[in-house]
């Protein structure tokens, strides 16, 4: 069932959530979620929308966990952690709206430039460690940390 969710994005393209967020293009699809670029019609800005697999909406435990995680993450306030802006549940979709980060991922950077220098690797590792330590103190655990989920933001550090 996850395959159907991940393979047919045309159904979701242009979909409006909560009368506010219009899905404009798919950014990524993995682990039973999709991340979409969306237009916030109220604040006239671009955001990212993380959708849970619609086949999971019938699973109340899954939706309860998804909402609980969104609530926990929304309480985090750290320069290296992406900000949760909103949540929405429309018909067959549950979503978390987050700030859109357009910077390069660590994965893409290494693909483009090759291995990191020791100095840069240590700098990035320290900043990630600081963010994870902060999140853990607040009871939030990432669970899927990898180079594709780390954005290199020159003005804020890795996110």
Region annotations inferred by a language model:
Residues 39-46:
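Conserved N-lobe loop of protein kinases adjacent to the ATP-binding glycine-rich P-loop
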């Amino acid at each position: 069932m996850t395959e159907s969710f991940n393979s047919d994005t045309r159904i979701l393209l242009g979909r409006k959530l909560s009368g506010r967020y219009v899905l404009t293009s798919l950014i990524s699809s993995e682990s039973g979620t999709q991340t979409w670029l969306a237009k916030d019609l109220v604040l006239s800005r671009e955001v990212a929308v993380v959708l849970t697999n619609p086949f999971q909406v019938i699973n109340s435990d899954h939706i309860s966990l998804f909402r609980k995680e969104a609530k926990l993450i929304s309480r985090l306030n750290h320069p290296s952690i992406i900000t949760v802006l909103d949540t929405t549940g429309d018909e067959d979709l549950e979503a978390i709206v987050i700030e859109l980060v357009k910077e390069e991922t660590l994965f893409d950077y290494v693909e483009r430039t090759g291995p990191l220098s020791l100095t840069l690797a240590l700098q990035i590792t320290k900043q990630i460690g600081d963010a994870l330590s902060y999140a853990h103190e607040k009871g939030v655990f990432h669970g899927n940390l990898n180079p594709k989920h780390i954005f290199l933001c020159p003005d804020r550090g890795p996110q």
